Amino acid sequence: MFGCQCPRKKKGTMTMMRLRTASLRSLNLDMRCTIRLLDDTEISFNIQRDTKGQFLLDYICNHYNLLEKDYFGIRFVDPEKQRHWLDPSKPVAKQMKSHPPYTMCFRVKFYPHEPLKIKEELTRYLLYLQIKRDIFHGRLLCCFADAAFLGACIVQAEIGDYDPDEHPDNYICDFKIFPKQSQKLERKIVEIHKNELRGQSPSVSEFNLLLKAHSLETYGVDPHPCKDSTGTTTFLGYTAAGFVVFQGNKRIHLIKWPDICKMKFDGKTFHVVVMQKEKKNILTYHTSTPAACKHLWKCGVENQAFYKYAKSSQVKTVTSSNIFFKGSRFRYCGKVAKEVVEASSKIQRDPPEVHRSLIPHSRSSYSLNKQLIINMEPLQPLIPSPNEEEEEEEEENQIDEGILLLQQSEASSAPVLGNSPARGLETTADVTHDEEESIREEPLTISEQVYNPSASLLPTPVDEGIDMLFNSPLRAEREKDDTDSFEDLEADEHAFLIAEEEEMKEARKALSWSYNFIMGNMQLNAFLKSFSKLLLAAIGLLMVVLPLLLILLESDIDVSFLREIRLTPEFEQFHHEYYCPFRKWVACKLSAALNLFGST
C-alpha cells in the first residue's frame, strides 16, 4: 500500500509543475500586432503581454523618423465596434478586448491649431494624409469653392503640373477624393489645377491644403453621435477652440475650453458643466452605449488638457463620479499643445526625407456613404466667436509669412501662380445651360444617413451606420423604397394610401407613448439614484459619528480635547437624560435574554 501511494503523489506533483510551467510560458508568448498607417500600408511585429502602448507609438515614430509625435495616437476597435485610443501608459493586452493578432490604426489624435508652427515637412505630410482621409470619409465639411480648391491641391500634390500629353480630359475621374463627386465639382478641380497651381511642389500643395483645411469649422472634429434632451440627433466633437455641437451641417454650440468647468458621465448620459458670464449651465446628451459615453468623456478630458493648459504639470486627475462614490478616474499623461510647439521650435537637425506613397486613385467610394454629396452651401455658425475677425486677420498674416518661408526653403519648387496661359476647358464647352441648372448643389450634412465615423476600405474600422445605433427611421424609409411591386397589384391605390396613413398615425402614437414612458422612467430612476446616494452618505456619516460617541462615553481616556467635550453642559445633559437610561434598558434586555437562554 505504501509503495502504491508514492508514485501517485509524485504524479500529482509533476502535473502541478507542468501547469505552472505552462502558465509562466504563456506570459512570455509573443503576440502578433499589425498597425495600419495613414497611407493604408501596414507594419507587423510581435509584442509581449506586458508591452505598453508607448512602445507601439515609439515604434511607428521611429519607423517614420518622426520627432513631432505628440499629435499622433493609435486607435483600435473592440468586438462591440466601439473605438478606443490606445493608452500609452497601460499594457496593450489589458486594453484589447479581443484575442491576438491585434489590428490597430496610426492616426492624428490632436490636430495642430496652427499648421504654420509645425517645424518639419514630414509632420505636415502625415497631417495632410489624415486630412485627405477626413475629406474622403465625409468628416471635413466645406462649401463648393473650398472643396474644389482642396481637391485641386490633392491632385497637384500627387501628379504635379497638368500635362495635356499625359492627362486626358477626364483624368480627374480617376481620383476618388470625395465620397461622391459631381461632374461640376470635377470640372472646377480641373480648372484650378490647370490654371492656379502650376509650379507648386508636393510640399507646397500639401501646405496650402493644410492652411485651407484648418480654417474650416469641422477641422479636427471627430463626430460622436448622440441624442440631446429633445431626442434630436446631434454630433459632438472637440477642436482646439473648444467643445462643438453639430446638428446637420450647422454648428449650434461652440463652448471654449476655459468656460468648461467639468465633463462627467453616468451610464449612457454625458454632462458638460459650463460657466459663462457667471451663469452655470449643464448640457446633457445621451449616447447609444455606456462604452460610447465613456469614450466621449475620455476624449473630452484629453482634448481639454491638451489645448487648455500651458504646462503638463497643471493637468490633474479627473473623475466622472460625485464626492462619495467611486467612478472612472483618468489623467492625461502627455505633453500639452504649448509644450509641443515649444519643443518643435527647438528641433535642430537636417529635415528627414519624406517618402510619399500614393493611394490608388481608382478605389471605389460606393461602398462607403452613397448619399454623401460634397456640393454644399457654406457652413454658418449659429454662435460665432466674438474675436473671429481679429483671428482671421492674424491667420492671414501668418499664412503670408508661411508661404514666404516655404518659397525661400524650396526655390526650385516655388509656386508660380497664373504665369502660364490658361487653356480652354474642352469639357465645359459642351455643357449647356440646362445641364448646369440640372446639377444641383445639395447641402452636406453630418447626418444619420451619411456619416460613418470609421468608414474605411479595410475590415478593421466600424462598418455600421449611425442609424443602427439609434434605430433611425431612415432605415424604415429605405426598406419602404425597396418595395416597387405595387403597380402589379389590383388593389385600389387610393385605399392603400389611406390605410398607410392610418398605420403611420398609429405608429406615431405608439412611438410618442413609448418616448414619454421612457423619459418618465429615466426621471424616476434619476430620483431613486440621487435618494440612494444621499441615504448611503448619511449611513456612512453615522458609521463615523457613532464610534466617536462611544469613545467619548465609555472610555477613560484622559485627553484634553475629550475632557473639554465631556465637561460641556450639552454633553452632560445628553449623558444623564438619554445615554444612561438607554444603557440601562439595553442591559435589562440583554440580562433577560441570557436568563431565558440559560433556562432553556
From Swiss-Prot:
Region (Disordered) location: 413-440
UniProt keywords, alphabetically: Membrane, Transmembrane, Transmembrane helix
A cellular component annotation (GO) from this entry: cytoskeleton
GO terms assigned for molecular function: cytoskeletal protein binding
Membrane topology: Single-pass membrane protein
Major site of localization recorded for this protein: membrane
Stretches that traverse the bilayer: 534-554
Recorded superkingdom: Eukaryota
Gene3D superfamilies in UniProt: 1.20.80.10, Phosphatidylinositol 3-kinase Catalytic Subunit, Chain A, domain 1, Pleckstrin-homology domain (PH domain)/Phosphotyrosine-binding domain (PTB)
Localization of this protein: Membrane
Classification via PANTHER family: 4.1 G PROTEIN, FERM DOMAIN-CONTAINING PROTEIN 3
Name recorded for this polypeptide: FERM domain-containing protein 3
